[in-house]
Amino acid sequence: MDSQRNILLIALALVSFLLFQQWQVAKNPAPQATQQAQSTGAAPAPSFSDELDPTPAQNVAAKAKTITVSTDVLTLSIDTLGGDVVSAKLNQYSEELNSPESFVLLQNTQGHQFIAQSGLVGPQGIDVTSNNRPAYQVSADSFTLAEGQDELRIPMTYQANGIDYTKTFILKRGSYAVDVVFDVANNSGSEATLGMYAHLRQNLLDSGGNLAMPTYRGGAYSTSDVRYKKYSFDDMKDRNLSAPNDVTVNWVAMIQHYFASAWIPRDEPQAQLYSRVINNLGDMGIRTPNKTIANGDKAEFEATLWVGPKLQDQMAATAPNLDLVVDYGWLWFIAKPLHWLLSVIQTFVGNWGVAIICLTFIVRGAMYPLTKAQYTSMAKMRMLQPKLQAMRERIGDDRQRMSQEMMELYKKEKVNPLGGCLPILLQMPIFIALYWALMESVELRHSPFFGWIHDLSAQDPYYILPLLMGASMFVIQKMSPTTITDPMQQKIMTFMPVMFTFFFLWFPSGLVLYWLVSNIVTLIQQTLIYKALEKKGLHSK
């Protein structure tokens, strides 16, 4: 197998990979937790959605007072009617490149609703009816984390039937995790029974993305049985989410490209999963078991809301397996170390584009023995071509005999006929893993390289990098020896750089940069290896 056929192999693998990823995003399998509840015979958790008024509140934020809470990284709008987070702006992430507007993750507008709701339900619950929720009292209309202050607390109070309810939001400097604590003081003269719920509500939208950049927008969850499982909007429409009673819920989330929102129960091993869809609005959340509070006693319910970018270190510290929302696919065990190495390099060079170049040299340097073995094997195969041709003329159409004698010749000459193919197959997982490492890295979002590349996570606006990449492939093709004589195969090989260029027009600039630099390294390594082969008497042409 010569290097031009390797290019064809890469192309086929690349196209197959892209089609598979697009299918995987579109056809996500049903959640494993539900399947376990059905297959093991364990009784599923009771449907919490039956406890709530099935009519969702319509634009609640427009009907009630909202307060603003600001830290260095978050600006939240909280509705005093129920204490829902109806808007979340990420102060350190812009909506668009060079835009002064912060990225809005949660919002409650006429065209789109994505909010984080939490409340108390049960016999003495105050949030059972969507349109009759508690009107909390709060001391001010806005709260700001002051300079030198590390924590900001916003208590909201409500009193009904002799029971005092306090809902407190706790935000910390530099953190996208918001603690939500309910304190209940029962002075009603009798027992009070209630539990907490917390869910995310969102319009059920399409996943988005394209063939080059397939992205997932939908739900996900983690339990003691399932470390990470996607629960798509289509799944949500088809069946309500539930899990066995003995399963511990780690978190539930709604995720999108680069960003995630999640509810994490605190000290509640019996919290239950649930979901429901009403009028194209999907709820996905957790429900804690009821607590019975004696007269004169107090109780506390707590959950944490993550609302921010997919930052792996912070998410891993917030909840078990929450960092898995950074989905590297089935080659995560390669992609995760690559992302770690890329981040380490960036801390030294200060530019993500330069870090990608350095990573490319490191990866290609590590794979140099494979590359050398590939070219050496191809050179040996070319040296055998006269003998193979003579063998074909001598044997004729007897394929079985031809195969036997070919294998004997390979064994005698110590040549592996797959030696030129296997190295390139081993390199493909590296490329695919790096593809996902770059695709899922929020750090690359709006990160510049130099010149016209202002965002490594977006396609090249002038298509210069893809064109350079295509040109480099053409040069590699011309420099590579070939034994292809079939006219059709020759046409396919000639067209291959054009096809690659077309595909890469829509790839993130960071990934195209990697492929371009990788091609340049290939040209350098190819030149050095050919010179070494010529010295050994193995012709490179």
Curated annotation (Swiss-Prot):
GO terms for molecular function: membrane insertase activity. Keywords: Cell inner membrane, Cell membrane, Chaperone, Membrane, Protein transport, Transmembrane, Transmembrane helix, Transport. Residues 31-55 are annotated as: Disordered. Its main location: membrane. Residues 31-47 have a biased composition (Low complexity). One of its GO terms (cellular component) is plasma membrane. One of its GO terms (biological process) is protein transport. It is a multi-pass membrane protein. It holds the Pfam family YidC_periplas. Interacts with the Sec translocase complex via SecD. Specifically interacts with transmembrane segments of nascent integral membrane proteins during membrane integration. This is Membrane protein insertase YidC. The gene is yidC.
